[in-house]
Amino acid sequence: MRLSDFYTALRLALVLPFFALYHMSRWVVMYFPAANVGRVVSIASVLLFLFIACTDFLDGYYARKSGKYSSFGKVFDPFADVIANVTVMLCLVADNFMPVFLFLCILYREFGMMFLRMLACGEGHVVGAQRMGKLKTASYMGAVLFSLLLKALYAFELAGADWYERMRAVGRLVYVVPVVLALASFFSYLKTFFPILKRVCGRTRYPVCKTCREWD
């Protein structure tokens, strides 16, 4: 296994531990009401997320350093990004840090990208992450980190309740930026996939799809 693929696999492996850690405080309180683990959990969640974000940087760094880009890595890296980002955002939706509507916009965008990638693979093409896609992922991580740090500040009583609620409202607006970049990157990817869509939709076994032929 290449070192870049190892870091991608590590990122994927840390997703469920993050989910469990994020919800640990409420699970512990259910069985041990006197326990107060909120501070430990909040700071540990921030640190684990930062490590997950570092693996995203490291896999790209070592791939560029070695100059070796495998078809597997081109598919595996964006797949791990999707699983990690969607799982972390789901945690924040549960705590009302992220609006459900914005989460659904991102989720549907990722489903759309998965469909396009599968379609491309069926045609023998592997399309890796583009610069716009990486920018989108960076905006995901920035918005998530803002929410996690805000939660940690409140857990350590470094933020008052009024200020905390105001910043939570600001945090919800912050997620508009990742959604805009996600949609922009989706349309950017469509330009790459367009020749493949034309070829697939132009076949007689797909007679119902005329849209691509009409775009000639």
UniProtKB/Swiss-Prot annotation:
GO terms for biological process: phosphatidylglycerol biosynthetic process. The chain crosses the membrane at residues 40-60, 88-108, 141-161, 176-196. The keyword Cell membrane applies. Its EC number is 2.7.8.5. Pfam families: CDP-OH_P_transf. GO terms for molecular function: CDP-diacylglycerol-glycerol-3-phosphate 3-phosphatidyltransferase activity. This is CDP-diacylglycerol--glycerol-3-phosphate 3-phosphatidyltransferase. It comes from Treponema pallidum (strain Nichols).
